[in-house]
């Protein structure tokens, strides 16, 4: 049985340690700028919101991001979603995505958005499967081993979620 719980600042090291279990994933996220210091800073920001996927009180996945409040209209920017290898392709990333809406709906959440590397096909499939629509491209945004990769912008309007 699993639980999805709100993450607290004390959870930052558990999340980073989970990523360190897979060196390829850790290398990828470091290319994106997620070192230990940046990761810790994210958890202590005033507008931080994250959810953890727990099995028997052991963290197996998470989503972290920022709550953006403009004139009491709430948006959420997903910065990182991660699932441990043993729990991938079992629907848990989708459960984390749907729980963002459930957790923030009481705060007048209107939109969830993110960016993803254009070569991250599994993530793109996850987002489109969960109703996120591509809204733009940042050309040559990421620099992976001296190769420029586009960033694709995706968003999900909450009114679309309510209709479906």
Identify the residue ranges that each predicted region occupies.
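Active-site acidic-Proline motif in GNAT/NAT acetyltransferases
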Residues: 84-86, 90, 118-119
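Conserved active-site tyrosine of GNAT-family acetyltransferases
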Residues: 127, 132, 154
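Residues forming the Rossmann-fold NAD(P)(H) cofactor-binding site
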Residues: 94
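C-terminal "cap" of GNAT-fold acetyltransferases
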Residues: 117-121, 140-164
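Conserved GNAT acetyl-CoA-binding A-motif
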Residues: 104-115
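Acetyl-CoA-dependent GNAT
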Residues: 2, 6-86, 97-99, 103, ...
């Amino acid at each position: 049985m699993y639980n999805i719980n709100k993450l607290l600042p004390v959870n930052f090291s558990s999340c980073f340690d989970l990523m360190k279990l897979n060196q390829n994933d850790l290398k990828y996220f470091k290319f994106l700028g997620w070192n230990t210091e940046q990761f810790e800073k994210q958890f202590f920001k005033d507008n931080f919101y994250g959810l953890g996927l727990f099995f028997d009180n052991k963290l197996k996945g998470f989503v972290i991001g920022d709550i953006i409040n403009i004139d009491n209209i709430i948006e959420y920017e997903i910065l990182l979603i991660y699932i441990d290898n043993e729990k991938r392709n079992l629907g848990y990333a989708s459960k984390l995505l749907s729980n963002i809406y459930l957790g923030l709906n009481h705060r007048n959440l209107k939109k969830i958005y993110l960016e993803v590397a254009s070569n991250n096909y599994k993530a793109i499939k996850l987002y489109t499967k969960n109703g996120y629509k591509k809204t733009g491209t940042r050309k040559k945004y990421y620099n992976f081993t001296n190769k420029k990769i586009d960033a694709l912008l995706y968003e999900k309007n909450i009114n679309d979620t309510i209709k479906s």
